[in-house]
UniProtKB/Swiss-Prot annotation:
Lineage, opening ranks: Eukaryota, Metazoa, Chordata, Craniata, Vertebrata
Family: Belongs to the sodium channel auxiliary subunit SCN1B (TC 8.A.17) family.
Name of the protein this chain belongs to: Sodium channel regulatory subunit beta-1
Complex and partners: A voltage-gated sodium (Nav) channel consists of an ion-conducting pore-forming alpha subunit functional on its own that is regulated by one or more beta subunits. Interacts with SCN1A; regulatory subunit of SCN1A/Nav1.1. Interacts with SCN3A; regulatory subunit of SCN3A/Nav1.3. Interacts with SCN4A; regulatory subunit of SCN4A/Nav1.4. Interacts with SCN5A; regulatory subunit of SCN5A/Nav1.5. Interacts with SCN8A; regulatory subunit of SCN8A/Nav1.6. Interacts with SCN9A; regulatory subunit of SCN9A/Nav1.7. Interacts with SCN10A; regulatory subunit of SCN10A/Nav1.8. Interacts with NFASC.
Gene, per the UniProt record: SCN1B
Source organism (scientific name): Bos taurus (Bovine)
Signal peptide: 1-18
Amino acid sequence: MGTLLAFVVGAALVSSAWGGCVEVDSETEAVYGMTFKILCISCKRRSETNAETFTEWTFRQKGTEEFVKILRYENEVLQLEEDERFEGRVVWNGSRGTKDLQDLSIFITNVTYNHSGDYECHVYRLLFFDNYEHNTSVVKKIHLEVVDKANRDMASIVSEIMMYVLIVVLTIWLVAEMVYCYKKIAAATEAAAQENASEYLAITSESKENCTGVQVAE
């Protein structure tokens, strides 16, 4: 159920899709002490175009004013900045085995309240064309709140309510079908019994007439 909900909510957040790549907004609520994935997906407009991409992530802690760089990922190498808030907690979860990065997501393990704030995923892409090269840059912004326990979103609540309504409706329909079938079978059985009784009376009457005819003949 959770997997299905997670899929429905993700599909609803789709912003664009080019050449099989789908851009999905990141979740924005992390639970204290748990692992949280911050999504950063940047699709190319043309999948057939060769490209090289690298990313830099910056962070502004809640209550502060300046962004600080926390990591850089380029040529399959993750370079982490010295920041005790993220030391031993950041794991690369984006594209692997390619320089053409489109998924630039990260994991933060053992989330703390110090991780609440604004994240920026800076995407730098070099596109290779036949006669020239072209640089592009995109910034994905994510605001993250850290809470004590997970809050159920409205989609989850509505989905669960609809599930229970569907169960009730199906149960009522099933009971109605069973009652209908029972009445139909009972009516057919009663009709067959009446028909058999009529045939029995007809046979009995005919037998009596035959017996009377035999007696008269004697």
